[in-house]
UniProtKB/Swiss-Prot annotation:
Source domain of life: Bacteria
Stretch list, region Uroporphyrinogen-III C-methyltransferase: 215-472
Keywords: Cobalamin biosynthesis, Lyase, Methyltransferase, Multifunctional enzyme, NAD, Oxidoreductase, Phosphoprotein, Porphyrin biosynthesis, S-adenosyl-L-methionine, Transferase
InterPro entries, per the entry: 4pyrrol_Mease, 4pyrrol_Methylase_sf, 4pyrrole_Mease_sub1, 4pyrrole_Mease_sub2, CobA/CysG_C, NAD(P)-bd_dom_sf, Siro_Cobalamin_biosynth, Sirohaem_synt_dimer_dom_sf
Pathway: Cofactor biosynthesis; adenosylcobalamin biosynthesis; precorrin-2 from uroporphyrinogen III: step 1/1; Cofactor biosynthesis; adenosylcobalamin biosynthesis; sirohydrochlorin from precorrin-2: step 1/1; Porphyrin-containing compound metabolism; siroheme biosynthesis; precorrin-2 from uroporphyrinogen III: step 1/1; Porphyrin-containing compound metabolism; siroheme biosynthesis; siroheme from sirohydrochlorin: step 1/1
Name recorded for this polypeptide: Siroheme synthase 2
Organism the protein comes from: Yersinia pestis (strain Pestoides F)
Active-site residues (renumbered): D247 (proton acceptor), K269 (proton donor)
Entry annotated with the keyword Transcription: no
Phosphoserine PTM sites in chain numbering: S128
Family: In the N-terminal section; belongs to the precorrin-2 dehydrogenase / sirohydrochlorin ferrochelatase family. In the C-terminal section; belongs to the precorrin methyltransferase family.
Region Precorrin-2 dehydrogenase /sirohydrochlorin ferrochelatase: start-end pairs: 1-203
Keyword NAD among record annotations: yes
Length: 472
């Protein structure tokens, strides 16, 4: 270990900064967050530091550095581009046994700044001992993505409750088990949803021995396929799951991000071939949550856009099970973006309509007259089976048979395939497309040939036969 990690209490302690430029300003901002009393030695200040001085946030010594300025200073930072001055600052500090840091000059540092993940009062520091600062920054970014922002609330509440927990539980082992349960159970879940009062009530119930073994359900949108489109919140919830119920539309890459020891249950549905009935899925969500498990219902795209997520949550809510919803990138947004097809465009479409090709058996017919109007984009989910009927109805109600269309198969995935043609060719295109597929109808499809960016560049469209663009 080249450096001993320490956390210093700088509240109201004097810290000297030598230098008044941008580098000094960055260090000063960090010191402000720690509550330090900042003194700056510099002949001139940057405009940012000048404003801080006018606001009374820093003290300014408009003079050259002198060793006696280190008297009664807790630590010093040299942030100048003068190597001779920096060395003099370090030597004077070292002689007085004062911690010193010379920015970007590790040999002249008795302490170094780590990369920081700030969830105060919880703080994570990462250091490469000055050997690979970029690597430390990359690790910090990964931790930022994994650690929920609400950890600060969790740590603050835990701090307020430490005394009460200690009064109720004399044994250190008992207290440890209490907090382990709290930080991985319903208390943590309530914090993540911003329900802080309810979270403290949960702690009180646990202390009084009235805790109920009740789990929760998280309805999570997995996005259209590319694991990079999974939301940060979705990843965090998946990493906390005890059991995951997922559909066929969820890509293997997204499933790989589920907590390793979580149970995985496929309740996938395909048009006309449901492996698990919807009623059975609804009941399974309730049963698992009533067993005290954290259940993630993982759905492709966004769970509230043609995903029957609302129906499932109605059952969960009626059973009194706590739940939360994590939105996802819906297929119409993700697949079209990866295909270079904007859903709206000032010159081509002022509106977009999302349609499902599978309605309830007793559902009313679509308003084809409205859907056939020009200057709009239609994005049709699960429409390949009914592509012929869709094409016929739109043409019959006035939409031109030469209207550009795209069928995007396995959108956003490495084997994405985009088929371009006209409304008259929609049935043929749909028959060729791999599933799952999205139908896009409207003049915006023509922009595909200009702004497609994912995978191979599009082939030239044929006016006679559909063009197939394999973006693998």
């Amino acid at each position: 270990m080249d450096y001993l990690p320490l956390f210093a209490d700088l509240k109201q302690r004097p810290v000297l900064i030598v230098g008044g430029g941008e580098v000094a300003a960055r260090k000063i901002e960090l010191l402000h967050r720690a509550g330090a009393q900042v003194w700056v030695v510099a002949q001139t200040l940057s405009s940012e530091l000048e404003q801080q001085y006018q606001d009374g946030r820093i003290h300014w010594l408009a003079q050259d550095f002198l060793p006696e300025q280190l008297d009664n200073v807790f630590l010093v930072i040299a942030a100048t581009n003068d190597t001779v001055l920096n060395a003099a600052v370090f030597a004077a500090a070292d002689q007085r046994c004062i911690l010193a840091n010379v920015v970007d000059d590790q040999p002249l540092c008795s302490f170094i700044f780590p990369s920081i993940v700030d969830r105060s009062p919880l703080v994570v520091a990462i250091s490469s001992s000055g050997q690979a600062p970029v690597l430390a920054r990359i690790l910090r970014e990964k931790l930022e993505a994994l650690l929920p922002t609400r950890l600060s609330d969790m740590a603050a509440i835990a701090g307020r409750w430490r005394g009460r927990v200690k009064q109720h539980m004399a044994s250190m082992g008992e207290r440890r088990r209490f907090w382990e349960h709290a930080f991985s159970g319903r208390f943590a879940s309530l914090i993540s949803r911003g329900q802080l009062t309810e979270a403290e009530n949960e702690l009180q119930l646990s202390l009084e021995g009235q805790h109920r073994a009740l789990g929760e359900v998280a309805l999570v949108g997995a996005g259209p396929g590319d694991a990079g489109l999974l939301t940060l919140r979705g990843l965090q919830v998946m990493q906390q799951a005890d059991v995951v119920l997922y559909d066929h539309l969820v890509s293997p890459e997204v499933l790989d991000l589920v907590r390793r020891d979580a149970e995985r249950i496929c309740v996938g549905k395909r048009a006309g071939a449901h492996s698990v009935t919807q009623e059975a899925t609804n009941q399974l969500l309730v049963t698992l949550a009533q067993q005290g498990k954290r259940v993630v219902r993982l759905k492709g795209g966004d769970p509230f856009i043609f995903g029957r997520g609302g129906e499932e949550l109605q059952v969960v809510a009626q059973a009194g099970i706590p739940f939360q919803v994590v939105p996802g990138v819906t297929a119409a947004a993700g697949a079209t973006a990866y295909a270079g097809i904007p859903l709206t465009h000032r010159d081509h479409a002022q509106s977009v309509t999302f349609i499902t090709g599978h309605c309830r058996p007793d559902g009313d017919d679509l308003d084809w007259q409205t859907l056939a109007r020009g200057r709009q984009t239609l994005a049709i989910y699960m429409g390949t089976v009914k592509a012929a009927a869709i094409s016929q109805q739109l043409i019959a109600h006035g939409r031109s048979s030469t209207t550009p269309v795209a069928v995007i198969g396995r959108g956003t995935r490495v084997d994405q395939q985009v088929l371009i043609g006209t409304l008259a060719q929609l049935e043929s295109l749909a028959q060729q497309a791999p599933t799952p597929a999205l139908l896009v109808i409207g003049e915006v499809v023509n922009l595909h040939h200009q702004i497609a960016w994912f995978g191979q560049q599009p082939q030239t469209e044929s006016a006679i036969s559909p063009s197939v663009v394999n973006l693998a």
